[in-house]
Amino acid sequence: MIDAFFIAGTDTDVGKTVASKAVLQALAAKGLNTIGYKPVAAGSEKTEQGWRNSDALHLQKAATLEVAYEDVNPYALELPASPHIAAKHEQVEIEYDLLSEKLAQHKEQADVVLVEGAGGWRVPVSDTDSLSTWVQQEQLPVVLVVGIKLGCLSHALLTAEIIKADGLNLVGWIANRVNPGTEHYADIIEMLESRIDAPKLGEIPYIPSAKRKELGKYINVEPLLNID
């Protein structure tokens, strides 16, 4: 069984956090201790406790183990922009060593660590580097979240290709219906199933305020548990 994996998205706003919550809930239903980890988050709000990102808070709440917010989300950036822009605005350098240190800490505590990315696969974290470089460094298996909408086929297939070209193991994908009006839904799913060389872990229907709902029933985590 893998002890950590990375949740990637075909783009921003495709439902990575919704899918992450669903996976965490499904893992918890199997009796596993989990931690949700959001290394970098842009679009945070100032609170009495410090800067907080809503997606990271959802991960913190969905996990079975209690972890300090600063360990769930070491880089909570204010601007709702690409991480490299938000980091530059705050004069912050995103250090891979810190991300790795937190990941190692989480692995010691949990059976499974779910690491949620930011934006799409090649989202920059500096003028010269992307978060995917750190994922390669850690050799994290990847689960791809596909937001089902017009144009998602090309985005999904290209992202799946580049993940594998980066030398990483694509261990599954999740369909998240972000637009209830998307036509030809079944045809889109059929094409993704035939073209993505990884198991479909589930389909999450369009659900208003999905981040606040019980979603684990939509996910089959068995393929993840059977990976050495």
UniProtKB/Swiss-Prot annotation:
It is an enzyme of class 6 (ligase). The gene is bioD. One of its GO terms (molecular function) is magnesium ion binding. NCBIfam families: bioD. It comes from the Bacteria. InterPro entries: DTB_synth_BioD, P-loop_NTPase. ATP binds at residues 13-18, 55, 116-119, 176-177, 205-207. Its EC number is 6.3.3.3. It catalyses: (7R,8S)-7,8-diammoniononanoate + CO2 + ATP = (4R,5S)-dethiobiotin + ADP + phosphate + 3 H(+). GO terms for biological process: biotin biosynthetic process. The active site is at K38. CDD domains: DTBS. This is ATP-dependent dethiobiotin synthetase BioD. GO terms for cellular component: cytosol. Its cofactor is Mg(2+). HAMAP family: BioD.
